[in-house]
Amino acid sequence: MVKVFERSATVLASQGAGVIAPAEVFRGMVARNLLPEDHPRCSVTVARYVRRDGDRAEGRWLGDVDFNLTTVSWADLFHELRRQAPPGAYHNGIEVHGLASDNDAAFVTMKTSEGAHEQFDLIVFADGYRSLGRQIVAPGTNLRYRGLVFWRGLISSAEADIDRLDGAVTRVVYPGGHGAVYLIPAAREAAVPGNRTAMWGYYLPVPADTLSSVLTDTHGRQHHGSVPSGQVRTDVTEAFSERLAELIPPYFLSLIERTAHTSIQAIYSAEVPAYAQGRLCLTGDAGTVFPPFSGSGVLKAIGNATSLHDSLAAAATIGQGLSAWSKQQQATIEALQPVAERIGKNLISEIPDLTSLSAADSYSWLSAIHPGAHITLPGK
């Protein structure tokens, strides 16, 4: 019997925005019957890079990089996957307070916040960047704050002109950071009707000593790593808007100004030496944590889950399956690590002077972010 213990008492469908990943990731989910063939999605064929250029509404175009990505609504994705959970399997508002293995590790006993003790053959931790499972499987792992927050929001086609964003993920670049803006299908249960929704998000520096203030919500509650949509204080949104008004083109600023509710996510990173121990394993951000700008979050989470299924199905024992799977995940992480570092360097920490880039410099910069990709520059 499968049981899912979700520590949040609220429905997680409201805790996300858009999901973007290579098109083959979603095709693979359809092939595994995790998503229906007609699941709402939008196609992205280019990554478009722009910068502020005076009063030009959409800024100056720096170049396009050919892509094959798909975007979906987080709310719809959650509802579809949640729908497939067996009846009675999902339990909201329950935390894991402790674990204990028997001598031969044939099962794990889990203690919940309700005082119950339950035994399982396998426990999969998917509990995010502050994972209890990581503390057990990889004790001493350093969770590092990167000095950035990701401020994001959603705005529907009924609220703003977003059709001009069609087919692209627009990266708005400025000194010390960048933003990403792209279309997703409007959630089926969206409060504001519209065929599509624009998701925007910007990386902004926030010193560690002021992070706790930024993460304190409208009710005075301090959050650990994120402030949910609709709970970001007005003084924080005003400060962020004023900062971006000097950095991004007017059109993209107007999307922010018309967005009713926003959320904040603090950016962390962590690396784990192993993904499994005994009958315990880590998936998603419970394992290695990459910043979202690496583009690996969805790819990593889905890859963790599907490969875990395949490894366990192919192995003679759970232990053998977990051992093979853990090694596979480590190899994948080693391949993704330089990608995350390269993107962070070129889009956060060492962004060149965009006002004086020659065509050759632009090509070199975009090639460093997207090695081997087809790049189109202005005038080409």
Where are these regions (language model features)?
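Conserved mid-domain beta->alpha element of the FAD-binding
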Residues: 1-8, 124-125, 200, 257-342
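Catalytic P-loop NTPase motifs of RecA-like helicase/translocase cores
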Residues: 11-12, 132-133, 289-291
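Flexible internal linker/loop segments at domain or repeat junctions
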Residues: 214-277, 281-283
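Active-site-adjacent segment of FAD-dependent monooxygenases/related oxidoreductases
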Residues: 8-87, 93, 97, 346-347
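Short, flexible helix/strand-to-coil boundary loops that buttress conserved ligand/catalytic motifs
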Residues: 15-16, 32-33, 136-137, 294, ...
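C-terminal helical "tail/cap" subdomain of flavin- and related membrane-associated enzymes
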Residues: 37-40, 55-56, 246, 250-254, ...
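Conserved FAD-binding catalytic core of PHBH/FMO-like flavoproteins
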Residues: 68, 79-243
